[in-house]
Amino acid sequence: DWTIFKPSVIFGDPRGRMEFATQLQRDIIGSPLPAPLFYPGLLPFGAGRFELSPVHVEDVASAFVTALQTPDTIGRTIALGGPSRLSWRQILETLAAVAGKRKLMLPVPALGISMAAVMLDRFEDFPITRDQIKMLLEGNVCDSSGLTELGITARPFDASNLLYLNNSNEGPETWHQNAA
């Protein structure tokens, strides 16, 4: 018997490990450099508009447990997405707000950064790989109906569910506790 889960990007308290929001907070929001709004092609139309539907790690864990107890899930593939489709820009703006920062954002051609990643992604400090850029531009969205079917209310990607970032050892010491 099997059930396959296909979650969108997962966020939530990583308990000392790296996850989606923690990595973005450390590598992009915490960086003195402007945040990249990637775009395909040669002109910056649509920079940062590709969408993701972040899903909370505890919602994913609840889905696993519920599926083990629900025979109707056997032999199914269940997409797990958060309650909202958010653009890359919206995600970065949310993370900046949680950090208590205003972050400059600039259009960056995906082709250029992909070429740089070919040469630099083998270095640990290079913040993004070619595969990550490709996945971001393709988007990673699904709705929360998989969670709803399992009786789980999806948590939004918002300040109240990102407060763990304020306690993270991965980011700047200046993150504010009052991001809500």
Residue spans of the language-model regions?
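A generic alpha-helix preference that emphasizes hydrophobic side chains
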Residues: 2, 21, 133, 157-158
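Oxidoreductase cofactor-interface core, primarily capturing Rossmann-like NAD(P)-dependent enzymes
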Residues: 1-93, 97
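Mid/C-terminal beta-alpha module of Rossmann-like enzyme folds, strongest
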Residues: 61-128, 141-180
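Alpha-helical membrane-targeting segments
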Residues: 19-53, 102-140
